């Protein structure tokens, strides 16, 4: 089993896509990249942390390349600190890796993707230093709150788009 930690906008949206994926064992939303011991409130108030999803996956069933390809389909890697209506540094596009092999793969992936994108890809690649699990009410948010307004307006259409691709 391997882990990759991704930030690409609201962590509810990113998790909703990856928790349904064959080969993904578990997902967990959290915070990384800022001050220690963050809370949702401190993140929203600019403590430097990014909303992220830790993806635990079986590399015999799904590759990191497949995960990154989907990641680039579900968010805009050319947008600085913004995804749709969600604006702030906590929505930064970032790949947190745990080993050099994954770092190199991510760098090569972005280099190849840049040939496709007309705008500059701003997705950062950084070694995972700290990770803090988000509050329990954020975990598997879409599964637990499918009728909530944000889920219906933002997450459900994103899932429908991915399923039709």
Curated annotation (Swiss-Prot):
Its EC number is 1.8.4.11. GO terms for molecular function: L-methionine:thioredoxin-disulfide S-oxidoreductase activity; peptide-methionine (S)-S-oxide reductase activity. The active site is at 10. InterPro entries: Met_Sox_Rdtase_MsrA_dom, Met_Sox_Rdtase_MsrA_sf. Signal peptide: none annotated. The keyword Cytoplasm does not apply. One of its GO terms (biological process) is protein modification process. Keywords: Oxidoreductase. It catalyses: L-methionyl-[protein] + [thioredoxin]-disulfide + H2O = L-methionyl-(S)-S-oxide-[protein] + [thioredoxin]-dithiol; [thioredoxin]-disulfide + L-methionine + H2O = L-methionine (S)-S-oxide + [thioredoxin]-dithiol. Has an important function as a repair enzyme for proteins that have been inactivated by oxidation. Catalyzes the reversible oxidation-reduction of methionine sulfoxide in proteins to methionine. Belongs to the MsrA Met sulfoxide reductase family. This is Peptide methionine sulfoxide reductase MsrA. It comes from Campylobacter jejuni subsp. jejuni serotype O:2 (strain ATCC 700819 / NCTC 11168). The lineage of its organism: Bacteria, Pseudomonadati, Campylobacterota, Epsilonproteobacteria, Campylobacterales. The gene is mrsA.
